[in-house]
Amino acid sequence: IFPTILLLGIYIDFENPAIRKLTMYTDEMADGFATMVESRDNNTGGHIKRTKAYVTLMLNKMRGDRYYRRVLSRDYITNVINAAPLHDVGKIATPDSILQKPGKLTDEEYAIMKRHAADGGKIIQQTFRDLDDADFRQIAYEVARFHHEKYNGKGYPDGLKAEEIPLHARIMAVADVFDAVS
């Protein structure tokens, strides 16, 4: 996994050092936010790193497919990988009593927990509003907001379905669920 990321980084570095530096800072900031959120949640140790690794694996596998090769540019892949750690950033607004609760959440607690997706979208918009990289900003927003949408339309926060859900949010959702059941 990491050699692939490293190779991708080297390619960007050779193409444009300024973009490589910006990508590095964006990646470090995303990882920092994610670590801050994860430190509040006793139940997710390593979740951020694992889901980022799963997203990386899926994107690299998809890039080998003829259909996705046309859709997945190197910049897009880099942006999705860098945005992946931010998918749960909205949990920073979730009370500790819910984040750290052992056992099953009540219906009311679950409703509060579900707000982390919409909260994450807002946090991304506010935090990165002045970032020149509009593509990263949009991808990060959509990954945070839509990673709990379901293909059948029964997800949250917006009840999007099928192709209404951005590809990167669907990829993040698969990584998130896979990590939860592993």
Predicted regions and their residues:
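Juxtamembrane or sensor-core-proximal signal-transducing alpha helices
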Residues: F2-M24
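Histidine- and acidic-residue-rich, metal-dependent catalytic cores
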Residues: E28-S182
